[in-house]
Structures are given as structure tokens and as C-alpha cells.
């Protein structure tokens, strides 16, 4: 009965941890959505201003400029990296425990994940379909397969258990 009680307590702790992680990500997601909606509204206002004061050609030039979407995507990735590492501060170390020593992964800078680490972070979060990972990271499915295949090949689990190991970190 003690064994059962310990297992039950461990399960409760795991559920509590998962609940806190979900709450954290939900709060971050909501904040990001509100920020994005405010930026879109500001962008719309600047387009209206451009049409009114500078003409349609100025507004068309603004619409053709990729800077708004590109900047937002970079900000989204930076926010994701920061949030993920805030919740899982030892993620990179845990990943590297499952990689061949000569193929350990590094963060390109403090609080920033590389593409490889982002792919693994998404797998850790339960997003395992390559098509969904590709969509989130704005990459082709082929590119994601290539990255993932390379990661798996250089892991200590070059079989199909690699994703399961990462998901359970």
C-alpha cells in the first residue's frame, strides 16, 4: 500500500507540474496575442494615415515591405525561446545527455534556441507531427525532416524512441 501511495503522490506531482506549465504557456500566449492585435491595429492606422496623407502608392509600398511580418516572426521566436527556457531551464543540458558527445547542441546566444533545439522543444511540448512543426517554425516539411533525421542520427537513441525520450525530458 505504501508503494501505491508513493506512486499516486508522484502522479499528482507530475499532474501539478504539467498544469503549471500549461498555465504558464497559456498566459504567455494570451499576452502575445494581445500584443500582436495591438501591433496590427497600429499598422492599420499607419496604412490609413499613409493613404490619407501620402496617397495609395505609399500604402501599397508599406504593404509590399516584408519588414512587419518578418519582425513579428522573429519576435515570436524570441518570445517562445525565452518562455520555453523559463519553464524548462535545463532543457539543453537534458537534451545533450541524449546526444553523442561530439554532437551536443549549443544555444547560439543566451536565452535563444537554435532551430534544432526549437524542433526538440516543440516535440517536448507534444507537437510531434513534422507538418505542424514546419508550420510553427515557418519552414518546409522537408527541412524539418532533414533537421530531425540529423538530430536522431547523432543521438544516443538513433531508433524510433528518440522522440519519446525528448517528449519525456
What are these regions (language model features)?
Residues 68-169:
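Cytosolic nucleotide-binding catalytic cores of signal-transduction proteins
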Residues 3-115:
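Membrane-proximal linker segments that couple transmembrane helices to downstream signaling/catalytic modules
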